Amino acid sequence: MAKYNTYTLENGLRIIHLPSNSQVVYCGYDIAAGTRNELSGEEGMAHFCEHMSFKGTARRNAIQIINAIEGLGGELNAFTNKEDTVYYAAISKEHFSQVVNVLTDIVFHSQYPQHEIDKEVEVICDEIESYNDSPAELIYDEFENLLFEGHPLGHNILGNAEQLRTYTTADALRFVRRNYRPEKMVFFVYGDIDFKRLISSPKFLDVPSGKAERGEIKRGLNEIIDTSICSDPLPPNLGGTYTIEKSTHQAHVMTGCQAYAYTDPRRMTLYLLNNILGGPGMNARLNLSLRERHGLVYTVESTMATYGDTGIWSIYFGCDHHDISRCRKLVRHELDRLMQKPLSPQQLIAAKRQLKGQLAIACDNREQFALDFGRSYLHHGHERDLETLYQRIDAITAEELQTVACDLFAPDHMTTLIIK
């Protein structure tokens, strides 16, 4: 793989570039401003500002923003999660300079006009309603809210309709000026561009300079606030079973627990364990048991997410209401197997081979790969390196897998949410 180029501008903005011989360039701003950066009373604000950033700057209205990139055959998009807001684009390399110009404009110079807010809030409220109508999606947010109740990590990314309708231009500017700061973001580029020209681009000079000073929160648009990760104490792991009644045709069940932070060395062990148990392969143990052997579910999967100071691991399945208990017992059986019996040498080799193959295929998705190495550099200060991942996977032992299983999968450690 080609070597990464990195550079930090005087204003604190970090730039990371990975060369490629493709005619297409993938690039964007990854900003450390997700839902966990919302203060009390700002729930949903990170996602709200992401939407509103496309509604006009001092130089471009909403239509001009879209046409500036899509009119050249490019793609412009954005998303918000718990720790990030990302604005990104794909464009043919001859139009790369135009993309830098537009992305920089919407990130640093959006105006959030009230008349556009009044319209876009209703769009987001429709998005919330659509989400609420899909319990298979809703359960992920409800489960995270349950595990992290009272903590910003438990905030629903979309927010709630009642609060969204109170937001104003001043509210949006306050959040953005606190969080959209050069030292809190990375500009990532994956493509065939001249790195020296990139870091000397005048487009990057059109960015606020200087770092925020730590201090007390002040009222007004130019408040100063600590820009570090939210330091609110994490709630204790919950445990128990909780039910949301929605009169659904199918029952939706999620069980899991708080898990490991990105920097925890056990993270990669859980990554392999998760793939064995409920990864995307049809040979995952949960799929073989609940779907192939017993025909009780269409979808069963386990997932994990890592944050700066914690993580989350969970299993999801959907089944008929009368099969909930049986499915839960089968899930418990698979968890107990991993706790009680280490993998054989042959099983361990096969599991590692499968995960490494999946990672290789995932890296072939160029857009997702660019997003991944941008996030890695923003939050952890290093590049995404497939060979290093392979080495970490190869070093995992059967005993380490069993230890992590015992640490996380104990019955009294698990929280279960049922929507039915």
Predicted segments, located by residue:
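Extreme N-terminal starter segment of soluble prokaryotic enzymes
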Residues: 2-4, 13-14
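Charge-rich, well-structured scaffold segments of protease-associated domains
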Residues: 3, 8, 64-226, 233, ...
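Active/ligand-binding-proximal structured segments within catalytic/core domains
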Residues: 12, 19-69, 265-277, 285-288
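Basic side chains
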Residues: 14, 36, 55, 246, ...
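Short, conserved beta-strand segments within well-ordered enzyme catalytic domains
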Residues: 16, 26-30, 53, 77-79, ...
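His/Glu-based metal-binding/catalytic segments typifying zinc-dependent metallopeptidases
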Residues: 16-23, 28-30, 213, 217-283
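Histidine-centered active-site/metal-ligand motif
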Residues: 47, 51, 151, 252
